[in-house]
Regions:
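Ligand-binding clefts of soluble mixed alpha/beta catalytic domains
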Residues: 1-243
Length: 243
């Protein structure tokens, strides 16, 4: 079958606030006998590194017949399996759950490795971003999750082809994840786009307020808007003055 779609077609796949298979956005999906087209040409997406670091999806696709590299976020919870070590009889298989939309040491490294491979192949890169940040657990910190996150920045700095970061509907890009794929990392080649229903920011609103709107600012605002408080402060000042 042909793997070339018309360039000016609409992306008709329906997205949800609930976790979903990101491949439906990349490849398109058939629902109720109707084809909903995804971002890339129908039947062109080829995933790589499938069984490693499943919170990140990486592969190659075509867009209007042009080959491109693709990195996307898995929004569903996935299972990570570390097999028992045959050299250690007392070891056991370790099965853990990894939340979607979070970079873990393995998925951060997978992201950096995929960027490097796509750069070496001379392909444009599409990053479909939906990350809340990096895993902050003690185990993941011990496994150097932030070091692998810095590898992502290193690879984007060295990237020579166009990079398009896209935040789809109902997705979010927050905290350290926003910093890692900020287009200012490589202004010459990187651009960022977002659906009007997406959300992004380095800090949550409460965090921004706590930094910008400190205790003294709150006190002045309270006094400006509360006549009773102004009266009490005036009485307190007189009492202190008399003493």
């Amino acid at each position: 079958s042909s793997t070339v779609d018309v360039i000016d077609r609409d992306v008709t796949v329906t997205l949800s606030r609930d976790p979903y298979d990101i491949r439906s956005l990349l490849c398109g999906v058939e629902r109720d006998g109707e084809w909903e087209s995804g971002l890339f040409d129908r039947g062109s997406f080829m995933e790589v590194l499938v069984d490693w670091a499943k919170t990140v999806v990486a592969g190659r696709a075509r867009l209007g017949g042009i080959p491109v590299g693709v990195i996307a976020t898995e929004s569903r919870t996935v299972e990570s399996v570390v097999p028992a070590d045959p050299a250690m009889p007392q070891s056991e298989e370790l099965v853990t759950q990894q939340a979607g939309g979070v970079w873990y040491p393995d998925s951060a490294y997978k992201t950096a490795q995929a960027i490097q491979d796509i750069n070496q192949e001379g392909l444009p890169l599409f990053i479909v971003a939906n990350w809340r940040g990096f895993s902050g657990g003690a185990r993941d910190m011990f496994r150097e999750v932030l070091k692998y996150g810095s590898f992502i920045v290193d690879q984007l700095v060295q990237f020579r082809q166009p990079v398009f970061v896209y935040i789809p509907a109902y997705a979010e890009l927050r905290g350290g994840a926003f910093v890692v794929v900020d287009p200012h990392i490589n202004d010459d080649v990187m651009e960022m786009y977002a659906d009007s229903r997406a959300r992004a920011g380095v800090l949550e609103p409460t965090g921004v307020v706590s930094i910008k709107y400190r205790k003294e600012d709150k006190r002045r605002t309270m006094e400006r808007n509360d006549a009773v408080l102004r009266c009490l402060n005036a009485k307190l000042s007189r009492v202190v003055g008399e003493e």
